Swiss-Prot record:
HAMAP family: Ribosomal_bL31_2. It holds the Pfam family Ribosomal_L31. The keyword Oxidoreductase does not apply. Keywords: Ribonucleoprotein, Ribosomal protein. This is Large ribosomal subunit protein bL31B. It comes from Bifidobacterium longum subsp. infantis (strain ATCC 15697 / DSM 20088 / JCM 1222 / NCTC 11817 / S12). One of its GO terms (cellular component) is ribosome. The gene is rpmE2. GO terms for biological process: translation. Belongs to the bacterial ribosomal protein bL31 family. Type B subfamily. Gene3D superfamilies: Ribosomal protein L31. Part of the 50S ribosomal subunit. GO terms for molecular function: structural constituent of ribosome.
Length: 85
C-alpha cells in the first residue's frame, strides 16, 4: 500500500437509534472524530459515537420483519400524492 493516500482507520461506536443497540467496529469516520460526540465503552476507553437509523440490528433483511422505517413522513407524503382515492 502507498504511504499517505489511505484514510485513518480506527474504532468507532455506532448507535442504531431504531433498535436502541450500540456496537463497536472500525471505520474511517474516526478521522472526523473531532466533530463527533464520544461515548465511554465497556472496556473503559472513549470512542467517537455515530448515530445511524438502520443497521443489521434493525434492517428487515437481517431481522426477517417487514417494517417501514419512515424518519421524515415520506410514506405519508407519497400516499397523499399518489395513493388510491
Amino acid at each position: 500500500m502507498q504511504e499517505g493516500i489511505h484514510p485513518e482507520y480506527g474504532p468507532v461506536v455506532f448507535y442504531d437509534r431504531s433498535a436502541d443497540k450500540y456496537f463497536l467496529t472500525k471505520s474511517t469516520l474516526v478521522a472526523k472524530a473531532v466533530n463527533l460526540p464520544t461515548i465511554d465503552w465497556e472496556d473503559g476507553n472513549t470512542y467517537p459515537l455515530v448515530n445511524v437509523e438502520v443497521s443489521s440490528y434493525s434492517h428487515p433483511f437481517y431481522t426477517g420483519k417487514n417494517v417501514v422505517i419512515d424518519a421524515a413522513g415520506q410514506v405519508q407524503k407519497f400516499n397523499a400524492r399518489y395513493g388510491r382515492k
